[in-house]
Regions:
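Membrane-cytosol interface segments of multi-pass membrane proteins
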Residues: 1-169, 300-337
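Hydrophobic residues within membrane-embedded alpha-helical segments of Major Facilitator Superfamily
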Residues: 13, 20-23, 61-63, 142, ...
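Aromatic-anchored segments of alpha-helical transmembrane domains
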Residues: 23-26, 97-98, 165-179, 220-234, ...
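Interfacial loop-to-helix transition and helix-capping segments at the boundaries
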Residues: 47-60, 123-138, 177-198, 229-254
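Structural signal for the C-terminal ends of transmembrane alpha-helices
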Residues: 68-76, 147-154, 174, 201-210, ...
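Loop-centered beta-sheet repeat module
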Residues: 159-208
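Alpha-helical transmembrane segments and terminal signal-anchor/GPI-anchor hydrophobic tails
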Residues: 193, 211-274, 289, 304-306
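Transmembrane alpha-helical segments of integral membrane proteins
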Residues: 288-299
Length: 337
């Protein structure tokens, strides 16, 4: 695969992944409204099941795209480059993440001047901003260890990488899954390391894997096992679909390889997909804001659930694109979003 085609497929991954995340969060946000959940329990269960194959692969694939690009032996990851990547994410947290922390405190407790800002900053340092920003915190950690991982993949064989990836998967994804299902404590730091597995898996998959029977079979088996779990314990099954548990990696690898294999065609320069690709990071960061606003409007909350969720998706994507482009007019944000 040529570099151009590889880049194009990753652009498609960003677009599809961003849209998938917005759809997932529309379901999650509406489920958290008690009156909506009580009146639509069966529909929410069906949506939870559908979200596994349609949306849960998105954030893992984001990590895998980063790993495929940044761990490429042909790419020089100097400390200066790492510093720029880390500063970009830190800037996002110190601005957008901090604003979300302030909004959360004001909505919950009211505004108390400097005390609110101090509490918001402490929450930000502890990772207590809006939940979807865990991805940004994780990227900072991945960028910091990229020089070490990059040096390793330059000398590692395919077998070496496979062993490291499998051991990491066992320790950081399988063990937490056993803990969740059986109530054991095989791995005390539950879920903290799974992004590393996806980061390495992205490089491995981009280098060695094709869309063949093995990849399809492993992904389909993991997906089927996760879906079967809904018949026994829907709440547990929903948790097992998260990236830090064992079912997500095989299916996410399948999604990643499928996108690389099937979506190699370039986007039209002035097309919708290209526009969404340019704004995909902003869409990921900003879309929850619009969902929160919509769910505070009584007239909108009374809409039929699918209509309400579609409204959240459409307004979330469109509003995020507009807000992203407005923020880019400010010099500090121009190269960050």
């Amino acid at each position: 695969m040529s570099e151009r085609k590889t880049i194009q497929s990753y652009e498609w991954a960003r677009v599809l992944g961003a849209l998938a995340v917005v759809c997932l969060h529309a379901v999650v946000a509406t489920r958290l409204v008690p009156e909506l959940h009580q009146g639509n329990a069966a529909l929410f269960l069906a949506e939870d099941v559908l979200c596994v194959p349609l949306t849960r692969w998105a954030v893992p694939v984001f990590f895998m795209v980063s790993g495929a690009l940044l761990l490429d032996p042909g790419r020089q990851m100097t400390l200066e480059k790492v510093g720029r990547y880390v500063w970009r994410m830190a800037f996002i947290l110190l601005t957008i993440g901090f604003a979300f922390c302030v909004m959360e405190l004001v909505a919950s407790f009211g505004f108390y001047g400097l005390l609110t800002f101090q509490a918001a900053f402490l929450n930000l340092l502890q990772g207590l901003s809006w939940g979807h920003l865990w991805y940004v915190y994780a990227l900072i950690g991945l960028y910091l260890i990229t020089p070490i991982l990059s040096a390793y993949v330059r000398v590692a064989t395919q077998r070496d990488l496979a062993i490291v990836a499998l051991v990491g998967y066992a320790l950081l994804c399988v063990a937490p899954t056993i803990d969740l299902v059986a109530g054991t404590k095989l791995y005390a730091f539950l879920g903290t390391g799974s992004p590393v597995v996806y980061y390495l898996a992205g490089y491995y998959a981009s280098t060695y894997l094709e869309l063949d029977a093995k990849v399809i079979g492993a992904g389909a088996l993991a997906l089927a096992a996760n879906l079967v779990a809904f018949a026994f314990d829907p709440e547990l099954a929903s948790q097992l679909a998260l990236p830090e548990y064992a079912f997500a990696l095989p299916f996410s690898v399948l999604a990643f390889v499928a996108i690389r294999s099937l979506l190699e065609r370039p986007m039209r320069e002035r097309g919708l997909a290209r526009a969404l690709a340019r704004d995909s990071f902003g869409i990921y960061l900003l879309h929850p804001l619009f969902g929160h606003v919509i769910l505070r409007v009584p007239a909108l909350v009374t809409l039929p659930l699918p209509v309400l969720q579609l409204t959240i998706v459409v307004v979330g994507v469109a509003g995020s694109v507009v807000l992203t482009r407005l923020l880019r007019l400010l010099p500090p944000f121009a190269s960050k979003l």
